[in-house]
Amino acid sequence: MTEPVRIRVESQAPYDVVVGRGLLGELVDMLRDASVVALVHQPSITTTVETVRDELAAAGLDAHRVEVPDAEDGKSLAVAGFCWEVLGKIGLDRDGVVVSFGGGAVTDVAGFVAGTWMRGVRVVHVPTTLLGMVDAAIGGKAGINTDAGKNLVGVFHEPSAVLVDLATLEGLPRNELVAGMAEVVKAGFIADPEILRLVEADPQGALDPAGEVIAELVRRAIQVKADVVASDLRESHLREVLNYGHTLAHAIERRERYRWRHGAAVSVGLVFAAELARLAGRLDDETADRHKKVLDLLGLPTTYDPDALAQLLEGMRVDKKTRSGVLRFVVLDGLAKPGRLEGPDPSLIAAAYSALTGAPEQKSGGSGVLL
């Protein structure tokens, strides 16, 4: 990818996702009309953000850094409250812009803060992790965690632009790059099988942050999300397909007190969802088995604690897709054919979890659909 690629998200307020290398300089042009700019970022990229702040200041913009905790520690009401206080102190009004720098967690909290400050101010996302690029920065969903669960408090607040500078991937720790690949693989299974073919053909290239394979994977995964978001901004039905693998994943994250990387949990969740669909008679063996094979090629986890099902069911009960106590899972009816499985029998869930862990089946508890 030599020239920047612009992917249009045709939502209620259309915007571009610009994908390329060496793009941070474009941010100045995007923000020229901003009264005040708040650069929300995680500690690990302070030097980069300070350089951006200096460039904005040189262009005559009133820009301020707002540092928030890394990863899921940054997605709390206390952190959002801190950000609101800073926005008040720097005088960010309705002509101001919030800019997020970092991974998915920073994107979430910055989007949430922007969406609630003065009932909504502009936000521009500059994701610097693979997960942020292909998932969190696109679509306008923003939320924070509470003791009740992950992302249960949030808003829909679309960005005015997303700037995906692939050069930032070159500074990522390898385990973070690997974790982000789970969302890329998810996009392959729900909509674009070419993603899976590219990974299978060159798994090392898929993890080379400076290579062309990862650039193509990122572009394709972003296009998948842009297409789905354009069809369903508010997650009423179609957009639920983006939660493939996430019902179990969010329960794992909650059980692990958010010490697991989101992508690692999604990887396990994808395998579980495939087993669930296989046992329900909805997914062929080849496609179900392909989940684990592709994820293994990338070094992602594909199993979990065999004794954790009861705790995980508690976490799944508070999943956003659950309705009136009935668990709902996104499953596949074939490659790139996502659907929904509602209220599966507890024995089916237990069997799928057993297939995931390779351990004897546990009793999932309860009966019928009231899991």
UniProtKB/Swiss-Prot annotation:
Query: InterPro entries, per this entry?
Result: Dehydroquinate_synthase (IPR050071), DHQ_synth_AroB (IPR016037), DHQ_synth_fam (IPR030963), DHQS/DOIS_N (IPR030960), DHQS_C (IPR056179)
Which keywords belong to this entry?
A: Amino-acid biosynthesis, Aromatic amino acid biosynthesis, Cobalt, Cytoplasm, Lyase, Metal-binding, NAD, Nucleotide-binding, Zinc
> From what superkingdom does this record's organism come?
Bacteria
Describe which pathway this protein belongs to, using the record's wording.
Metabolic intermediate biosynthesis; chorismate biosynthesis; chorismate from D-erythrose 4-phosphate and phosphoenolpyruvate: step 2/7
What cofactor requirement does the entry state? Co(2+); Zn(2+); NAD(+)
The parts of the chain that form a coiled coil are none
Enzyme Commission code(s) on record: 4.2.3.4
Q: Name one GO biological process term.
A: aromatic amino acid family biosynthetic process
Sorted alphabetically, which Pfam families does this protein's record hold?
DHQ_synthase, DHQS_C
GO terms (molecular function) for this protein are:
3-dehydroquinate synthase activity; metal ion binding; nucleotide binding
Cofactor stoichiometry and binding?
A: Binds 1 divalent metal cation per subunit. Can use either Co(2+) or Zn(2+).
Primary enzyme class: lyase
Q: Which reaction does this chain catalyze?
A: 7-phospho-2-dehydro-3-deoxy-D-arabino-heptonate = 3-dehydroquinate + phosphate
Q: Where does Zn(2+) bind?
A: E183, H246, H262
Query: Where does this one sit in the cell?
Result: Cytoplasm
GO terms for cellular component: cytoplasm
Q: Where does NAD(+) bind?
A: 70-75, 104-108, 128-129, 141, 150
What family name appears in the similarity comment? Belongs to the sugar phosphate cyclases superfamily. Dehydroquinate synthase family.
What does the UniProt function comment say about this protein? Catalyzes the conversion of 3-deoxy-D-arabino-heptulosonate 7-phosphate (DAHP) to dehydroquinate (DHQ).
For this entry, the protein name equals 3-dehydroquinate synthase
- Identify the species of origin: Saccharopolyspora erythraea (strain ATCC 11635 / DSM 40517 / JCM 4748 / NBRC 13426 / NCIMB 8594 / NRRL 2338)
